């Protein structure tokens, strides 16, 4: 279990508008929890539940 998410890492979890998960991949809605990307990163906006602002985001690497 991810200590900050009510699901197993890699399992399904509820994807709200914000997420405090560290490594939980929300397979139930095909989104992952990660830092927000800079504006203009469409890939992150479509496949990420933001947990905090960052100019470096794994979704956009």
Curated annotation (Swiss-Prot):
A GO molecular function held by the record: zinc ion binding
Residues reported to bind a divalent metal cation 2: 7, 13, 15, 26
InterPro entries: Metalthion_dom_sf, Metalthion_dom_sf_vert, Metalthion_vert, Metalthion_vert_metal_BS
Sequence positions that bind a divalent metal cation 3: 15, 19, 24, 29
A cellular component annotation (GO) from this entry: nucleus
Gene name as annotated: MT1D
Beta as annotated region, ranges: 1-29
Residues annotated to bind a divalent metal cation 7: 50, 57, 59-60
Binding-site list for a divalent metal cation 1: 5, 7, 21, 24
Record has Cytoplasm as a keyword: no
Domain notes: Class I metallothioneins contain 2 metal-binding domains: four divalent ions are chelated within cluster A of the alpha domain and are coordinated via cysteinyl thiolate bridges to 11 cysteine ligands. Cluster B, the corresponding region within the beta domain, can ligate three divalent ions to 9 cysteines.
Binding-site residues for a divalent metal cation 6, renumbered to this chain: 37, 41, 44, 60
Pfam families linked to this entry: Metallothio
Family the entry assigns: Belongs to the metallothionein superfamily. Type 1 family.
Quaternary data: Monomer.
Binding site for a divalent metal cation 5: 34, 36-37, 50
Keywords for the protein's UniProt record, in alphabetical order: Metal-binding, Metal-thiolate cluster
Location of region: Alpha: 30-61
Organism: Sus scrofa (Pig)
Protein name in the entry: Metallothionein-1D
């Amino acid at each position: 279990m991810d200590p900050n998410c009510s699901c197993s890492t890699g399992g399904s979890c509820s994807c709200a508008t914000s997420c405090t998960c560290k490594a939980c991949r929300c397979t139930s809605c095909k989104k992952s929890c990660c830092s927000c990307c800079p504006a203009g990163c469409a890939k992150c906006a479509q496949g990420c539940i933001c947990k905090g602002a960052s100019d470096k985001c794994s979704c956009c690497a």
